[in-house]
């Protein structure tokens, strides 16, 4: 009973004990692990049933997080649309230099938080006037401080975060040990070695550097498979 309760409230337990929310990365990809063509085209790799399941995970999450690259490429909204919901999750964009266009669809409807490393007062004011909240967390490399952002989301009361991002942000979050679970939607297709991968992890020189996973669940949605896995902690 206790284990079942902890599983149902894993995000809350993690936030109370670690000061971090449960971070779950959702990635749609081909069977050879590719998430988009070399030119960025990715709509749609998976079918409608898999996408609807993805909206269920959006609906249960406190926040949906992405990078500015995904917003610029797809004009992403990050809202729950394909399933019934009583609330919309907080939408979070990591945008180190505040490149967000002021006519981006994600600015519609409010409930949007932008994390940036920029201290440009005019840019911040413009984004805030367009309806978003802006928080500055800069790392030493001039990019957004990922751990500080995730800790801030925990401080805002977020228990579960769904990440829907590209290979660079997916890789950075994994490398910093911030990802707890993966939702991998596999489509029965091959996109080739020039297509973009699921996570940019750089070169590993030893198997000791690998990120190990534990299987949680495998299900089929239409013609696609969903693999639910957790990241093993060393």
What does each of the following model-derived ranges do?
Residues 3, 7-15, 21-234:
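Enzymes that bind and transform nitrogen-containing heteroaromatic metabolites
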């Amino acid at each position: 009973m206790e284990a079942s309760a902890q599983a149902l409230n894993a995000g809350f337990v993690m936030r109370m004990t670690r000061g971090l929310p449960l971070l779950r990365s959702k990635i749609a990809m081909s069977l050879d692990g590719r998430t988009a063509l070399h030119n960025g085209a990715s709509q749609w790799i998976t079918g409608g049933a898999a996408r609807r399941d993805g909206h269920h995970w959006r609906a249960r999450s406190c926040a949906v997080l992405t990078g500015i690259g995904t917003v610029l490429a797809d004009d992403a909204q990050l809202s729950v649309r394909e399933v019934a919901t009583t609330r919309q999750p907080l939408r979070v964009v990591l945008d180190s230099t505040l490149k967000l266009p002021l006519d981006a669809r994600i600015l519609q409807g409010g409930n949007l938080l932008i994390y940036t490393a920029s201290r440009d007062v005019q840019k911040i004011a413009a984004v805030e006037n367009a309806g978003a909240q802006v928080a500055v967390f800069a790392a030493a490399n001039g990019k957004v401080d990922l751990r500080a952002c995730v800790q801030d989301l925990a401080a805002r009361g977020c228990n579960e975060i769904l990440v829907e991002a590209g290979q660079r942000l997916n890789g950075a979050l994994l490398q910093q040990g911030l990802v707890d679970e993966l939702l991998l939607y596999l489509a029965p297709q091959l996109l080739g070695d020039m297509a973009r991968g699921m996570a940019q992890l750089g070169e590993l020189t030893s198997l000791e550097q690998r990120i190990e996973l534990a299987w949680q669940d495998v299900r089929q949605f239409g013609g696609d498979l969903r693999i639910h896995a957790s990241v093993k902690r060393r």
